[in-house]
Amino acid sequence: MVALSPSYRDGALSALAAREVDVLVIGGGVVGAGCALDAVTRGLTVGLVEARDLASGTSSRSSKLIHGGLRYLEMLDFALVREALRERDLILQRLAPHLARPVRFLYPLQHRGWERLYAGAGVTLYDTLARRGSLPRHRHLSRRGAMRACPSLRRDALIGALQYYDAQIDDARHTMFLARTAAAYGAHVATRLEVTGFLREGSRMTGVRVDDLEHDRTFEIRARQIVNATGVWTDDTQSLVGERGQFHVRASKGIHLVVPRDRIQSSTGLILRTASSVLFVIPWGRHWIIGTTDTDWRLDKAHPAASAKDIDYLLTEVNKVLATPLERADVEGVYAGLRPLLSGESESTSKLSREHSVVSPVPGLVVVAGGKYTTYRVMAKDAIDACVHNLARNVPRSVTDRIPLLGADGFPALWNRRGLLAAESGLHVARVEHLLGRYGSLVHDLLALIREDPDLGRPIEGAEDYLRAEFVHAAAAEGARHLVDVLTRRTRISIETFDRGVVAAPHAAELMGRVLGWTPSQREREVENYRLRVEAERASQEQQDDETADAARLGAPEVVPIRVS
C-alpha cells in the first residue's frame, strides 16, 4: 500500500524532475486530487503539485456536506442538482462509504398552508432527482413530531417541519484519500512545491518551474498537458502564464461555527431559511457545525478571516429558532473558507455561478474552476477529457465512477465486525467505530501501530477523541509535513476543542517528530508557530470588519519549513 511518507515525497520529486509526464496537475484540493486520480486511472503518467498541504484551501473549509443543494432548485437549476445528487450517491455507496454517511435534517415550517405545499413540492422534487433507494425519502412532521426530534427548538418558531436526508463527509480527509489513491495507482504527488513560473516553447506550455519549500531549491517539471486546478487562486496562477484568461474567479467567504453537541438537544440537523440564503446546523460527532455566510472576499486568500460581525450574524440567525440561545462562550471553533465562483454580472456572490468551466486558453494548458465540492469528480473528468483531446492520442475514458478510494474496499464487512475488532485490539468499540469512520479498511495500519506500541492506543492529551497512533500515521502515511497539517486537516482538533488544539500541540509534535526526524528545537518551532496561529485567529475573530480581521490574522507567521540540506 502506497503511503505518502517522507521517503515517498523524495521519490516523487526525483521522478518529476527526471522525466516528462503526460499530465501535471497544479493544486492539491479536491478538484486537483480528483484530476490526478482520473488521469492516472486512464493509464496516463501524472504529477500533482501543491504549494502548501493537501486540502489546505477551500477543500478543508466547506460545510462538509455531500448534497444536491436544495436552494438551487429555487433557481431552477435542475441539471446541477441532479448531477450533484448522482455524485452524492456514488460517494455514499461506492467511492467512499467509509468517509461519507447519511445525515437527517429538519426544515421548520413557520406558515400554515402554502409553505408546507411549496417546501414539500421542492423536497419531493429533490427526492425524485436522486436515485431511488439511495437515502430515505422525506417526511412531513407535525410540530409535536418536530419537537420530539429536536427538543431545543422554540415552540413558537414552527408549526411543523419537513424531514429529509443528505450526506456529509470530512472534506479534508476525503481530499487526502483522493490524492493517496492517485499515488497508489502511480501518480507522483508532492506538497510544499510552489509553482513560480511556466515553461514555454513557442506558444505552447511545456512545464513549470517550482520551488521546493521544504528543501529550499528550485527545479523544472516537464509535462505534455498542465491542469490549473487552483480554485480561488485560478487567476493568480493564470497571471504566471502571461495570457488573459477566458473567465475570472471571485472568492466568496463562508464561515462556520462549531459548538459542543450538548448545547443543542436534537437527534437531527436543521436547515433554516435566512433573508438571503439558508443556514445549516449539522451534526458532527460530539459537536454541531453552524453555517454558513456568503460574502465577497478580496483580501488574503490563504487565510480568510472570520470577523466578530460574521460570528454574531450566525449566532443571531440560529438563535431565532432555539429555546436556549447560544452565546459566544459556547463557540469551540470557527473556520472560514472561500468558494471559487465564476464571475457573473451580479454583485451578489450568492447569485454567482456554481457551475464549473473547463477551458484551454493556450496550447498545453487546461483550466478548471467553479463548481461545488460534491461535483469534484465530474469537474476532474471534464478537465482530463480536455487534456486527452489535446494529447491527440487514444486514451481510455474516465473510470473514476468505478474506482473506490483507499479504505473503501471491505468497509461494510469491517463495520459489521467492529465488535470483534474491538475485542481483538483491546480498544472500546466506540474507538474502533471512530477509526473505521476515518480510515475504513486501512484501520489495520492503525491497529498494527498500537500492537507494536500499546502507548499509541491512548488518547492524545488535550483531544481525547483522537488516539496517539493517528498522529504517527498522519506523518508516516498521509503526507502531513507540519504540525498545522495534522491539527487542522488530518484531525479537526483546531475547531473541536475550546483551546483550539494548543494543549495537544506539543504532544502531537512529539509523535510526528518521531517519523519526520525533528530535533527538540524543530518541535518547539512547530508548536510555537501553531500557538501564534491560534492567537492570530482569536484576535481576528474579535474584529468588527473584514479588513481589520484580515490584518489581525496575518499577524501569525507562515508555516516554518523544516529545512533539509
Describe every region a protein language model picked out.
Residues 40-60:
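Glycine-rich FAD pyrophosphate-binding loop
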Residues 28-29, 51:
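Glycine-rich Rossmann-fold phosphate-binding loop(s) that bind the pyrophosphate
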Residues 19-21, 215-225:
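Core beta-strand elements of the Rossmann-like FAD/NAD(P) dinucleotide-binding domain
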Residues 26, 221-231:
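Short hydrophobic core segments
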Residues 191-206:
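A conserved short coil-to-beta-strand element within the FAD-binding core of flavoproteins
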Residues 20, 52, 98, 111-122, ...:
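C-terminal accessory subdomains/tails of enzymes that are appended
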Residues 1-23, 38-42:
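Extreme N-terminal leader/targeting segments of oxidoreductases
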Residues 64-149:
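Dinucleotide-binding Rossmann-like beta1-alpha1 core, especially the glycine-rich loop
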